Amino acid sequence: MEELKEYSCVILSDIGANTLLLPSATFARSEKRPNRTKLIRDYVREGGGLIMVGGYLTFSGVDAKGKWHDTPVQEVLPVEVLTVDDRMEHCEGVTPKAVKPHKILEGIPEEFPDVLGYNKTIAREGAEVLAEVEGDPFIAVMECEKGRSAVVTTDCAPHWAPVEFCEWEHYGLLWKNIADWVTKSE
């Protein structure tokens, strides 16, 4: 935990829970190791920031292999992770829209560039949904005891985030605002 506290924020993107739950010492040699999902949960509760970004192994992901639903990290996320494959593929593009004013969205237009997919989630009680896509959370945030968490349910890079999203003039500001909010630097 002390090493984790050296950082203001943890960002999880395109990583399944098993990456943290099955370190090589445990998987290959059956050795005990700290549960890193518990460490992240406790880190957030004690004042750290957490951002989860969508992708094929984030949230529940492809074939539900992300497996974040039943982990301690779920306790500090502003959304409920599904137990089934949660990928919402939209090759035609779908437009995320801001639905609630918040510091994270300062300087950001109400409509975002289209995305080509996202992870379907359900907002948790106590969370604030700041932007939606197809009626689902796109950006959601939550206070978690002394810390904060945020989710962006699409990827930060292709294929779900096409060029027009990644090169959007507000792209950098959006991520800066999210990081500033979860780290209480705003």
Across the structure, where does each feature detected by a protein language model lie?
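Extracellular ligand-binding/catalytic regions of CAZymes and related secreted enzymes
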Residues: 124, 128, 144-148, 154-186
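Alpha-helical scaffolding within the catalytic cores
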Residues: 1, 38, 134-138
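An acidic, glycine-rich "communication" segment
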Residues: 49-136
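Stable alpha-helical elements in mature extracytoplasmic
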Residues: 3, 36-39, 69, 171-175
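A general structural signal for short secondary-structure junctions and capping/turn motifs
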Residues: 1-2, 42-43, 65, 119-123, ...
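Sec/Tat-exported extracytoplasmic proteins
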Residues: 11-14, 44-48, 77-81, 178, ...
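Short, conserved loop/turn and helix-capping segments at secondary-structure boundaries
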Residues: 30, 34, 67, 165-172
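Short alpha-beta junction capping motif
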Residues: 5-62, 143-148, 152
